[in-house]
Design a protein with these regions (language model features):
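Short amphipathic helix-loop junctions that connect adjacent transmembrane helices
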Residues: 6-22
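Loop-to-transmembrane helix entry/capping segments in MFS-fold secondary transporters
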Residues: 19-20, 104-114
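Helix-to-loop junctions at the C-terminal end of transmembrane segments
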Residues: 35-49, 133
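Structural signature of the two symmetry-related core transmembrane helices
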Residues: 51-66
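Helix-loop junctions at membrane interfaces in 12-TM secondary transporters
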Residues: 68-79
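Intracellular juxtamembrane helix-capping segments at the cytosolic ends
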Residues: 89-103
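A membrane-interface helix-boundary motif in multi-pass transporters
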Residues: 131-150
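Multi-pass alpha-helical transporter architecture, strongest
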Residues: 144-170
Length: 170
């Protein structure tokens, strides 16, 4: 998620999207994001945080695939709206799920660790994309590591067992 957020403008610029359109797209993400986060919150309460995370990972996955083929500002805006529709939901559901997995009396320490891993991901993801750009000389192919990272995240999440007795943490 951090990789997508940090590379969106660079990606748009590299495929020929005008700066004004990139800025507009980033604003679209914010306007779509607020109501979408409320929607995902409802879905999380109705089903589960894991369901929201899996669903939003799938949508991110589709967005990354779509990004490999887009070429116009309109397509870039559509991608921005798609990403905006899941960005807040995946972040909120991830934090909610994490809070259900940690000891309540150590939440500060664990959320500090959570943020550290998030920041590490914001460095490692773009580094992988940069490596792929260096190897394949194409930013479109360079988004492949993002797909791999989403797949790995979903695979790891599969093994996470949520203990219902921890639900009082939220």
């Amino acid at each position: 998620v951090h990789t997508v957020m940090s590379l969106a403008a660079i990606f748009g610029d590299n495929i020929g999207i005008e700066q004004s359109s990139i800025i507009t797209a980033l604003i679209v993400v914010q306007f779509v994001g607020f109501p979408a986060t409320l929607f995902w919150s409802y879905i999380g309460n109705k089903f589960s945080d894991k369901f929201v995370i899996y669903s939003t990972i799938f949508i991110y996955f589709c967005g990354v695939i779509f990004s490999m083929f887009l070429s116009t500002s309109t397509e870039f805006f559509n991608l921005a709206a798609l990403i905006g529709s899941v960005q807040g939901g995946i972040q909120a559901a991830s934090r909610s799920l994490f809070s259900k997995l940690i000891p309540p009396h150590q939440s500060g320490e664990f959320f500090g660790l959570y943020n550290t891993f998030g920041r590490a991901g914001a460095v490692m993801g773009p580094a992988l994309v940069g490596l792929f750009i260096g190897i394949f000389e194409s930013i479109r192919i360079a988004v492949l590591p993002v797909i791999i990272l989403f797949f790995l995240g979903a695979a790891i999440l599969y093994f996470v067992k949520v203990n219902p007795s921890n639900f009082q943490n939220t």
